[in-house]
């Protein structure tokens, strides 16, 4: 298994954090790529190197949350 590059992980984390922050301020359907990259202080090229669109970053965040929540439930209930 190949480990992801540290700069890739850092960029993706910055983009995800920016999206989460923005989602607390405005409706998710109104968040744009420009909003995310401005908040993350990264370029649009960096965004598109990792995600095809804003919906994909939202889905990734949701899927990770669900996965972690299910793991938590498994550990606490069984």
Where do the protein language model's features map onto the residues?
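Basic, helix-initiating cap at the start of DNA-binding domains
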Residues: 1-22, 26
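Alpha-helical structural segments
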Residues: 13-21, 39, 56-76
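Helix-turn-helix
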Residues: 22-55
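Primarily secretory-pathway and cell-envelope proteins
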Residues: 1, 44, 76-78
């Amino acid at each position: 298994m190949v480990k992801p590059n540290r700069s890739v992980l850092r960029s993706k984390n910055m983009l995800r954090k920016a999206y989460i922050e923005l989602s607390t301020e405005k409706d998710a359907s109104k968040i744009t790529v420009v909003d995310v990259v401005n908040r993350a202080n990264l370029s649009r090229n960096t965004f598109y190197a990792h995600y095809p669109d804003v919906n994909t970053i939202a889905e990734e965040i949701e899927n990770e949350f669900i996965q972690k929540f299910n793991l938590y439930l498994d550990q606490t209930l069984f």
